[in-house]
Structures are given as structure tokens and as C-alpha cells.
A protein has these predicted regions:
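Conserved donor-binding/catalytic core segment of Leloir-type glycosyltransferases
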Residues: 8-10, 163-181, 186-192, 204-207
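Glycosyltransferase donor-sugar binding loop
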Residues: 46, 203-217, 233
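Acidic anion/phosphate-binding donor-loop and adjacent secondary structure
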Residues: 139-140, 148, 152-168
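Nucleotide-activated donor-binding/catalytic signature segment of Leloir-type glycosyltransferases, i.e.
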Residues: 216-236
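Acidic donor-binding loop of glycosyltransferase active sites
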Residues: 245-259, 273
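Short hydrophobic beta-strand element within catalytic cores of glycosyltransferases
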Residues: 251, 270, 274-277, 287
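Conserved acidic donor-binding segment of nucleotide-sugar-dependent glycosyltransferases
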Residues: 289-290, 294-301, 310-316
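A short, well-ordered alpha-helix in the C-terminal region of glycosyltransferases
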Residues: 303, 310, 317-331
Length: 347
């Protein structure tokens, strides 16, 4: 029987704010699931305070490292650069066991940029990565202790889906709002389709927190678009299914370098929405092209506009995909992955 009574999680909890980016949501989900599944005391070190209350974060970190043997970390790129050497020191000094739950999908690039990362990562008990592709790339760089745990969310997967759709077909984006997530690509595609048909064939609703660096540009953009495009604000991560379940499909034309296993795809599948996504990072590992969505560019579909037009003209196929989406969504419920995490910590 495990003797573990407490662990710590170092990650971005968002302070007292309602922050809904992927890093914060993943950190909160892990904390809540472990809290519900174990009797452990779980300490929180919130990296949200790095610029707002740096002395508090430093003190919380020192207390955590001196008093806790098992530490899970979920860190941004800058967080890794600060915490990796500190954790490595305490690992060697006190035998601290570090479990790295990776945010995003570009760790292999960081290892190439910062060669010291290789030793840090190999000294951790495990690196939980979000895709098999990243695991293989890291293995080629000499990182040998990776296990795949995809993004998971405890969502109420729909039991049935809508089978009746007509013009205008409603599409949505459900992610952080920034240019690199393909927001402008999606707007341009929908506007171009409607213009070419001479009527409103499709609509686009955009959900998510607008990235600080993109706010001015996005506000200006929304002043110029047609009424077919609208911004719907933010939705709590556990309310996503209810918010998007009536849409025809989700658009995910991302080209963001930090993309890992996008939680928005789990949201979409749980709501029975096929996903139209770029062939970017691990999207093709999750979305089955022509099975529960479209990965483009492919042999027949070269861009987002073509993908949307294909879906509009192949309604029967898209509706059949919705059943596959719901089946796939059940793979991303937390239970099995939380058991895997607990087993690893208790070893």
C-alpha cells in the first residue's frame, strides 16, 4: 500500500482569475482529478504569480521543494528555463521525484535549443507527453523516459446528436483567439464562400479568450466583418459541450508553434462536432481524416475554404461522422489516465 500522503503541483492555476487557456485548464483538471481520486494532500505552487507577486512565488517554491518529495510540474517555456535547473538540484540533493506533465508539442525544439534540457528531462521520473509523435522525436534526441498521456477532460459526452442541418451552416472556433490559431483564415474562408454563393451559406461563431497581443487587431477586424461572423466570448471549460453542441463542425486552422494535443478537439468530439483542422503538429494523430473530420491540405482538399465547401455539399457524410466523434470522445475521459498517473507516483 502506498505511503504517499502529499504531493505538489507546480503550474499555472490562474490565481483568482477565470483564465481559460490550455495551460491553465490542463493544470486545474489534473489537480481536481487527483484530488477526487486520492486521499493525498495536494499543495499548489501557482506560476501565475511570477510577474504579479514574484516573492510569493519564490517563497511558495522554496517551501514546496523543502517539504515535498513528489512534485508534478506543468510549465511554459520560460517556466522550464527557470524550474528545470532548480528541480534538478533538489532532485540530486534531497531525492525529490519530479513528474513532468508536458504543456504543448514543441519540447523537441526546446531540447535542441537548450541542450541542458536533455539531462534535466532524463533525470525526471517521467515525462508525460501528449502525442506519440512527440515521444518518438524526443527519443531520437535521447530522452528515454516519456509516456503518452493525451489531453483529457471530464465532459458530459452527448448521447445523441442533431441530424438536421440547413443553410446557413453554423461553424465555430473554440480556442484562444489569436492569429496563429487561424482565426483570420477561418473568417476569410467563410466570408469568401458566402460572397461566391451570393447568400449566407455559412456562419462562424468564435469562442475563447482573446490573446492580449491580439486584442487591438481582433477588435479592428470585427468592425470590418459581415454579420455572418460573431464573437461569442468565453465559456468555462466544463460548459463547452452545451455551448457548441448545435454547430455543424468546428474549425481549427492552427499554425501555432506551441500546439500540442489541442483540448478544443476533445471539446468538439464530446459535442459530436467533426473537426476541420490543419495538418499541424499532432492534429492528424487525433482527427481521422474523412472519418471524424478533415485534415488539410490533402490530396483533394487544399485549404480551409475547400474543406468547408466539401462539408456543406456532403451533409450525409458529415452527419455520419458525428457518431464517430462521440465514440472517439470517450477515449479522452480522465479515469484511465489518472490511474496511470497515480500508479507512476506510487511506484
Amino acid at each position: 500500500m502506498s505511503q504517499i500522503k502529499e504531493i505538489a503541483i507546480i503550474g499555472h492555476f490562474g490565481g483568482n482569475e477565470e483564465i481559460l487557456d490550455g495551460q491553465t485548464v490542463k493544470t486545474k483538471i489534473l489537480y481536481n482529478e487527483l484530488k477526487n481520486a486520492t486521499g493525498w494532500k495536494i499543495k499548489k505552487v501557482d506560476t501565475y504569480y511570477k510577474s504579479k507577486k514574484p516573492l510569493k512565488l519564490l517563497w511558495d517554491t522554496i517551501k514546496c521543494l523543502l517539504t515535498t518529495k513528489h512534485i508534478i510540474i506543468l510549465l511554459s517555456r520560460n517556466g522550464m528555463r527557470f524550474y528545470f535547473p532548480v528541480l534538478s538540484f533538489f532532485l540530486n540533493l534531497l531525492g525529490t521525484k519530479v513528474y513532468h506533465d508536458l504543456i504543448g508539442g514543441s519540447l523537441d525544439k526546446l531540447v535542441q535549443q537548450y541542450p541542458d534540457f536533455k539531462d534535466y528531462l532524463n533525470n525526471f521520473k517521467v515525462n508525460w507527453v501528449e502525442s506519440d509523435g512527440l515521444k518518438q522525436r524526443l527519443y531520437k534526441l535521447g530522452i528515454t523516459n516519456c509516456e503518452v498521456i493525451p489531453n483529457f477532460k471530464r465532459l458530459n459526452v452527448l448521447s445523441q446528436y442533431c441530424e438536421e442541418y440547413a443553410e446557413p451552416y453554423r461553424f465555430c472556433i473554440f480556442s484562444r483567439v489569436m492569429k496563429e490559431k487561424g482565426v483570420e483564415t477561418a473568417i476569410d474562408a467563410v466570408e469568401a464562400i458566402n460572397k461566391s454563393f451570393g447568400r449566407e451559406v455559412c456562419k462562424l461563431d468564435i469562442y475563447g479568450r482573446v490573446d492580449d497581443s491580439y486584442k487591438t487587431r481582433f477588435e479592428e477586424l470585427m468592425q470590418t466583418v459581415s454579420s455572418s461572423i460573431s464573437y461569442q466570448g468565453m465559456v468555462p471549460y466544463d460548459k463547452s459541450v452545451e455551448a457548441i453542441k448545435d454547430y455543424y463542425a468546428l474549425l481549427f486552422p492552427t499554425y501555432w508553434d506551441g500546439e500540442g494535443f489541442p483540448g478544443t478537439i476533445v471539446d468538439a468530439f464530446s459535442a459530436g462536432l467533426p473537426v476541420i483542422a490543419t495538418n499541424w503538429n499532432c492534429n492528424a494523430e487525433i482527427v481521422d481524416d474523412m472519418g471524424n473530420g478533415i485534415i488539410y491540405p490533402n490530396e483533394d482538399i487544399k485549404n480551409l475554404r475547400s474543406a468547408i465547401e466539401w462539408c456543406i455539399s456532403h451533409k450525409k457524410e458529415v452527419i455520419n461522422w458525428k457518431k464517430s466523434c462521440l465514440e472517439k470522445a470517450r477515449e479522452y475521459q480522465p479515469d484511465n489516465y489518472i490511474k496511470q498517473i497515480i500508479r507512476t507516483i506510487e511506484e
